[in-house]
Structure formats: structure tokens, C-alpha cells
Amino acid sequence: MTINVNTNVSAMTAQRYLTKATGELNTSMERLSSGNRINSAKDDAAGLQISNRLTAQSRGLDVAMRNANDGISIAQTAEGAMNESTSILQRMRDLALQSANGTNSASERQALNEESVALQDELNRIAETTSFGGRKLLNGSFGEASFQIGSSSGEAIIMGLTSVRADDFRMGGQSFIAEQPKTKEWGVPPTARDLKFEFTKKDGEAVVLDIIAKDGDDIEELATYINGQTDLFKASVDQEGKLQIFVAEPNIEGNFNISGGLATELGLNGGPGVKTTVQDIDITSVGGSQNAVGIIDAALKYVDSQRADLGAKQNRLSHSISNLSNIQENVEASKSRIKDTDFAKETTQLTKSQILQQAGTSILAQAKQLPNSAISLLQ
């Protein structure tokens, strides 16, 4: 064994291993204290890139879930207001049916109409005041809104809200009134029993309806018979004995053509009708009350269709949230496997590094004493 004092190779070797053990000890302590296996790019460059992408996706999913919940909140707010609007329309329908009864006097019908007008005002108030985050939902100004329900661009759904004001054209339709009044003694002539209705629906479907009325039916029986043949429009009789037809707004596009011998007998003409909405309802007369029922039925159908659409959107958003939550769970699990510290493994590494550090320190101390052997040779 060579003994020298200029170069202590043993000490240098011990110091190298001590430095390595200390570095590993520091790394283990950093990982255990931070909880992250990757604390800088030098720990795992590829793993850092992957974990950062997964972090961005997870954060995006978290925001998307909040966005979806906001969409549900808007839908719930609008649907709750529409529920109250439905209750108002149901009450107005009750009033119209009550007013159509022949036992009511003019003053009684006027009282019923006053309540109906007050309900129309409340219908408008609900439409104008229902809002979410400062945006009006049911007065027609909301239009459509896009809800970002994904962690990447383009992952959105569109929710639209329309007006449910009493004067909205979709809350009604068109009315057609015969020119010739008929008394109770009148009956459908055997030579003029045919009625033909031709019109186009909003969805583009062409409708041709041929009706052969019953010979001898009076005007009220005729209205009942027509209603039994179709649900696309409603027939009723006003206080003067005139047949009136009401067509809900979604069921007609353009002219409503009426022809046939019975149409001529009644003076029932087609063409563009008189547009009527819930705002135009007047139940101070039998005819107005009868027509009001058709208008309100059309309005109820319209509001119900809007509520159904909102319900479908809520269900879609709820399923979207469940899916986003599942994706986020798996993304976080993947990120954890890449970036998080395995405490069992790292604790073992810490113990190993501590032992090696202690051993290295002890060996280095002994190695530093080796040059002293040269002094003993000089004595």
C-alpha cells in the first residue's frame, strides 16, 4: 500500500460517495416534504410535460363543471318562472270556461274579465323580471347562450330562451269568424255538408282536411263535430251564433284556406286571420270566452314545449357533469401516478440515504487520518 500526503485518494472516494448520498438524501426530503416526485424538469422532463398537460385538462374540467352547473341554474330559474306562468294560464282558462256559461250576467262576466286582465299583467311581470346574473330570461332578450362544458375549445352546448309575455305571437294564433250567424233552429243543409280546410304548418307539412258534417246538426253540434275530427284547430260558437275557428300559431304558416258548400252557407272565409294572443283575451262575451280557451290552450302548449326543452337541457347538463367528474377523476389518477411521491418507496430511499450519509461521514473521517501514518514513519 502506497502512503503519501499530497493526494488522499481514500478521502476523495469517501467524499464522492458522501456527496452522492447527501444529494439523494436532499432529493428524498424534497419529495417527501412537497409530496411531488417531480419538482423540477431535472427530476423527469418527459413526466413533467405530461403531468402539466394533465393538470391543464383537469383544471379545464373543473371549470367546465362549474359552467354546466351555471347552465342548470339558469334552466331551473327559467323553468320555475314558467311553472308559475303555467299556473296563471290554467287559472285564466278556468275563468274563460266559467264566463262561457250561459248563467252569467254581463256584470259577472266583467268581474271575471277583470281578474283575467290582472293575470295577463302578472304574466308579463314574471316575463320581465325573471333574471339570472343580470340577464333577463323570459322577455325575449336572452336569445341563445353557449355553455362551455368541456376542457377544450368547441366543446359547448347552446341553450335558447324565448319570450313568454302575454303579447308574444307564439302565445296565441289566428282567428277566423263566420259572417253569417245561425240560430238554434238552423241545421246543416243536406246539400251543403262539405267543409275543406287547407293550410301549411310551420314545419312545412301541407294539411288538407275534408269534413262532411252531419245532416241537420245545429251550429253548436257542428262545432263539436269539427273538434272531433282534428286537434290542429278549435271550433266554437260566439254569442251571435257565428262559427269561429282558432288556429294555434305553430300550426299555420301563411293563409288558412276554407272552402266547400258549408263554408259558403256559413260565410266562413279563409285567408290571413286575425292574430290573437293571451294579451287580446276578452271574456266579457260568450264568443270571447270560447275563443279564449283555444288561445290559452295554444299558450299552454307553447310554454310546456319550452319547459320540456329546458328539462332536456338540464338532464343533458347533469349527465355532462357526471361524465366530466369521471374524466377528471381518471385524469387526476394518471397525474398522481406520474407526479406524486410514493411515500413508501421514498421513505425507504430516505433511510438508505441517511445510512449511506452517516457511513460516508464516518469513512471520510477515517480516511483523513491516513496521512498521519507518514508522520509516524518519520519519528
From Swiss-Prot:
Show the SUPFAM superfamilies listed in the entry.
Phase 1 flagellin
The chain's coiled-coil residues are 104-129, 314-341
- Where does the UniProt entry say this protein principally localizes? secreted
GO CC terms = bacterial-type flagellum; extracellular region
Kindly list the places in or outside the cell where this protein is found, as annotated in its UniProt entry.
Answer: Secreted; Bacterial flagellum
**Which InterPro entries would you find in this protein's record?**
Flagellin, Flagellin_C, Flagellin_C_sub2, Flagellin_hook_IN_motif, Flagellin_N
- For this UniProt entry, which segments traverse the membrane? none
* Keyword Secreted attributed: yes
State the UniProt keywords alphabetically: Bacterial flagellum, Coiled coil, Secreted, Virulence
Gene Ontology molecular function: any one = structural molecule activity
Q: How does it assemble?
A: Heteromer of multiple flagellin subunits including FlaA, FlaB, FlaC, FlaD and FlaE.
Write out the similarity annotation.
Belongs to the bacterial flagellin family.
NCBIfam families the UniProt entry points to: PRK08869.1-1 (NF006466), PRK08869.1-3 (NF006468)
The job of this chain, per UniProt, is described as:
Flagellin is the subunit protein which polymerizes to form the filaments of bacterial flagella. FlaA is required to form a core or scaffold into which the other flagellins are inserted to provide structural integrity. Essential for flagellar synthesis and motility; important for full virulence.
- Recite the other comments: V.cholerae is able to differentially regulate the flagellins within the flagellum maybe to produce flagella which are particularly suited for motility within a given environment. A flagellar filament composed exclusively of FlaA is fragile and easily broken.
Protein name from the UniProt record: Flagellin A
Which organism encodes this protein?
Vibrio cholerae serotype O1 (strain ATCC 39315 / El Tor Inaba N16961)
